[in-house]
Amino acid sequence: MRGIRRREKAIEGHEEMVSILTEAKYIMMAMCVDNEPYLVTLSHGYDREKNCIYFHCAKEGKKIDILRENNTVWGQALLDRGYAEGECDHLFATVHFRGTVTFLEDPQEKEQALRVMIHALERNPEKVASEQVSPESVERVGIGRIDIEYMTGKKSEEVIISV
């Protein structure tokens, strides 16, 4: 795979990429079947120990159909640092990743994944988990796990070149 052309913008450290994955409010995940691309935006939780991303979803639908046929995905987590007014530049930090999606069946793994997502997204995760996570909710919800195989990062924290 071709590397980043602007080396000064490359994120080299794994921990910095993980930080972006955990700080981002959502991810975009691209998938493809029969040469037709499909892109979705997802709430997520990143599990550092397993180097994976969890997302929740319905148990049926277009995304599920595509992923059952081709479970390889490309995704992005983006931290938008804003447009640099008058400089024709945008400040950001982003991580792109490739991985494979597995839909979880084991209730214990699904519950753990839900807790990872709740801790990533909620201000009061313990309260929300106690109210929302039950054997019934775990059974009802679909949970996907993206096992990350490759990550790359890029950032623009200051205007380097103005038009």
In which residue ranges do the predicted regions lie?
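A generic structural signal for nonpolar/aromatic side chains embedded in well-ordered alpha-helices
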Residues: 20-21, 66-67, 117
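Anion-coordinating catalytic cores for phosphoryl-, nucleotidyl-, and glycosidic chemistry
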Residues: 9, 18, 53, 62-65, ...
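Charged, gly/pro-rich active-site loop segments
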Residues: 2-8, 83-163
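Short Pro/Gly-enriched beta-strand edge/turn motifs at strand-loop
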Residues: 11-12, 23-28, 125-128
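Short beta-strand segments
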Residues: 23-59, 75
